[in-house]
UniProtKB/Swiss-Prot annotation:
GO terms for cellular component: cytosol. It holds the Pfam family RecA. Residues 327-374 are annotated as: Disordered. Keywords: ATP-binding, Cytoplasm, DNA damage, DNA recombination, DNA repair, DNA-binding, Nucleotide-binding, SOS response. The lineage of its organism: Bacteria, Bacillati, Actinomycetota, Actinomycetes, Kitasatosporales. It comes from Streptomyces lividans. Residues 338-374 have a biased composition (Low complexity). Belongs to the RecA family. ATP binds at residues 66-73. CDD domains: RecA. This is Protein RecA. Its main location: cytoplasm. SUPFAM superfamilies: P-loop containing nucleoside triphosphate hydrolases, RecA protein, C-terminal domain. GO terms for molecular function: ATP binding; ATP hydrolysis activity; ATP-dependent DNA damage sensor activity; damaged DNA binding; single-stranded DNA binding. The gene is recA.
Length: 374
């Protein structure tokens, strides 16, 4: 077949596919508009930089896992607050039945407009997730946690019954269904996960996450969060130093790390992170115990400098913008003239995210094909 005949045959096939499955079902990559990746800021500048795109990517599956009390829910609630500040709709599926509304409020979450579900079993939870995602009205949905998505058969069965692989099959089926809908509706799904230990592992890490392997494959970003140090004020513990490793990243280079402070009752210390990154990148000068920025003293000791930036948010926004511009993350050239703090606009909701139809039955598919032929 000659080259022109092959091209004509391909064009005819593409036209037939578009007629049968709708416009955009197949296209040449050059015809697709190359839009920057939309993100939701995490609340930590260091983590936004480590992610490579300025935050958690929209329309993707994200897994956050780590030991108990490492900051998984805190990190996720900051993402929820940032999505809401940008005008987005957020749902929180609390399978653990452990969400503290007062703590969420302190972190900046608008609890009055947060859509909350506390399902009875794993099937119900994932069905709710599927329906909410297909509505096309959400910007972010959080599932806390995968380990708490207990299959109905396990709940209704006896305590000693064995249900090998039941939860893994449930997660695999759910992710197959929702991944496409997430991408079409630009909804981000954050799955919080717990750690377990494999028995009899002699070499390598014995740690593994719950829910089988499906989530590892479907997740575009996987974050391993660990508490590395306890922050103290005298003898009193006031927070934790936390390290997050980007174990998997499909939107930027992986294996980068970020460290930040989580203060009890306050969440991630954005100002503390800005001081650390400001010193690292040469914007904030540290001489002895004093921190200075462009000749102005921020304070003696990190705690005083942190409080100064907290009282002067415009200055904090200015330092953050300079750090992100230097590292080429999260700030686009056309945004350089916008007001401070406007980088969260990259998390703005899609104005007209289409509702994603539920999967059609084989019968409906045949009738559509017959209509296309006629």
């Amino acid at each position: 077949m000659a080259g022109t005949d092959r091209e004509k045959a391909l064009d005819a096939a593409l036209a037939q596919i578009e007629r049968q499955f709708g416009k955009g079902a197949v296209m040449r990559m050059g015809d697709r508009t190359n839009e920057p990746i939309e993100v939701i800021p995490t609340g930590s500048t260091a983590l936004d930089v480590a992610l490579g795109v300025g935050g958690i990517p929209r329309g993707r599956v994200v897994e956050v896992y780590g030991p108990e009390s490492s900051g998984k829910t805190t990190l996720t609630l900051h993402a929820v607050a940032n999505a809401q500040k940008a005008g987005g709709q957020v749902a929180f599926v609390d399978a653990e039945h452990a969400l503290d509304p007062e703590y969420a409020k302190k972190l900046g979450v608008d609890i009055d407009n947060l859509i909350l579900s506390q399902p009875d079993n794993g099937e119900q939870a994932l069905e709710i997730v599927d329906m909410l995602v297909r509505s096309g009205a959400l910007d972010l949905i959080v599932i806390d946690s995968v380990a708490a998505l207990v299959p109905r058969a396990e709940i209704e069965g006896e305590m000693g019954d064995s249900h090998v692989g039941l939860q893994a099959r449930l997660m695999s089926q759910a992710l197959r269904k929702i991944t496409s809908a997430l991408n079409q509706s630009k909804t981000t799904a954050i799955f919080i996960n717990q750690l377990r230990e494999k028995i009899g592992v002699m070499f390598g890490s014995p740690e593994t996450t719950t829910g089988g392997r499906a989530l590892k494959f479907y997740a575009s970003v996987r974050l391993d969060i660990r508490r590395i140090e306890t922050l103290k004020d005298g003898t009193d513990a006031v927070g934790n130093r936390t390290r997050v490793k980007v174990v998997k990243n499909k939107v930027a280079p992986p294996f980068k790390q970020a460290e930040f402070d989580i203060l009890y009752g306050q969440g991630i210390s954005r100002e503390g992170g800005l001081i650390d990154m400001g010193v690292e990148n040469g914007f904030v000068r540290k001489a002895g115990a004093w921190y200075t920025y462009e000749g102005d003293q921020l304070g003696q000791g990190k705690e005083n400098a942190r409080n100064f930036l907290k009282d002067n948010p415009d200055l904090a926004n200015e330092i953050e913008k300079k750090i992100k511009q230097k590292l080429g993350v999260g700030v686009h050239p056309e945004e350089s003239a916008t007001e401070p703090g406007a980088d969260a606009a990259s998390a703005a909701p899609a104005d007209a995210a289409p509702a994603v139809p539920a999967p059609t039955t084989a019968k409906a598919t045949k009738s559509k094909a017959a209509a296309a032929k006629s």
